[in-house]
Amino acid sequence: MDEIESSAVNAAASELRSIIERVERLEEEKAAIANDVKDVLGEAKGRGYDTKAIKTIIRLRKKDANERLEEETILQTYMAALGME
């Protein structure tokens, strides 16, 4: 391998190492955030709130209004078909 190829390989290895280290840092941050969310939900539960309902509301708030309405309509249709309403 000549000097140019060796330099290119070293540059690629350095770039790859940098990418991997960035992903590892982000994974650590994600784990820390997940623990923070767990703590907040534990606090809510301790204050008497239903954490399952809170998680459902958070999931629904992430959707736009049309998507949420469509999901609710389908759910109501299925529940009516099963005699649950």
UniProtKB/Swiss-Prot annotation:
Q: Which GO terms describe its molecular function?
A: DNA binding
Q: Which Pfam families does this UniProt record tie to the protein?
A: GapR_DNA-bd
Q: Which domain of life is it from?
A: Bacteria
Question: Which HAMAP family does the entry mention?
Answer: UPF0335
Q: Which family does it belong to?
A: Belongs to the UPF0335 family.
Q: What is this protein called?
A: UPF0335 protein Oant_1161
